[in-house]
Amino acid sequence: MSLLSEILNRDMDLFYEYLDCDVKKSDSTSDFKLVADFTEYNPLHNGHYHCMKVARSSVPDSLFVAVVPGLFERSGRGIPYILPREKRAEIAVSLGADIVVEGPPMGLMGSGQYSLCLCKMFAALNTDYIPRGYNPHEGFDEILSRINQGHHIAPKPYKIVDKTTGEVLLKDKLKEDNYVITSFSNSLSKIGFDYKDKFIFVKRIGGVSGTKIREAVTNGEFESVKDMMPDKTIEVLTNDKKSIIFSKRLDGNIIDNANNLDLNNLNLLNDKLALEIESKRPFNNLDEVLNAIPQGFSTHFKQRILSILENPIPKKDMSDFIEKYPSQIRILKYKNDDVLEVFKEKVNTENIYSVK
């Protein structure tokens, strides 16, 4: 069995373990400040490292927790991560994170679904501060200011709305990183989480190209991108190439599921989409499946559909998963036992499981 098969089979079991676990709230309290950073670390590059260092210096006596997706190893774009989350967690702790916890299965969810899950995780962690990188954009500073005033900011198609005041703050399509910030504000407001003065906004640094890093991973040559990533990331990518799962899929699973499942039952697939794909059966290879998927609103739509065909989660199960999330907190890596004890006293759940 391949590494990818082992990971995806295990993660399907873990998904249903989450689903079967009852939420248990904790009565513990702690004045210790917790900084929770959602980040994919795909892989951990200088931009991530800069954000971590700024957050740590802003709240020096704090617990830095990285929330790293997650089950099925598929990114928000629906494509396979470069490294499994355990390796990403290892790199993060070596560079300054205190604890890394498992985030939601981004690549199998719609953007609103995983944004809601992440915000529920922030609440469960009893988060005091949330660092977030952003790209400077005309008019965006006012949006950031409103968010840190605790206003309910919501992204709409080609505009950003302050739902607290009813104003349209921006008429434009946001870049992905900036969109995530407004989506967080919207989801945090929906669950009643008070985020006034809790965001630490960090201006993105230059000199990092995700495209070039992915090309280097594909080619196995990192000399051209060594200045974009910390030495630890380069070390893992160079010395542990067997762990690299980038661009790898279980093609046979995708083809078999596309041919045989009732696609309308799966998360992300509505009646129209399911019928359109099913009408082009049978499929003999991955390209035929990919070509049968119409282009959606998102540029990454096709890859997300491939991911759900690869790891078929029914709509009902995903809905129940989101409703209970996080039914347990899985720790992927932690700095030491003292940090772990502080973490357990801080968070709002008794269901804490460590893979260490």
What spans do the regions from the language model cover?
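Conserved structured core elements
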Residues: 46-49, 86, 179, 207
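Active-site cores that bind ATP or allylic diphosphates and position pyrophosphate for catalysis
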Residues: 2-32, 78-79, 95-356
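N-terminal catalytic cores of NTP/NDP-binding nucleotidyl/phosphoryl-transfer enzymes
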Residues: 20-84
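Short, structured active-site "lid" loops
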Residues: 85-97
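Generic structural signal for well-ordered alpha-helices
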Residues: 52-53, 89, 119
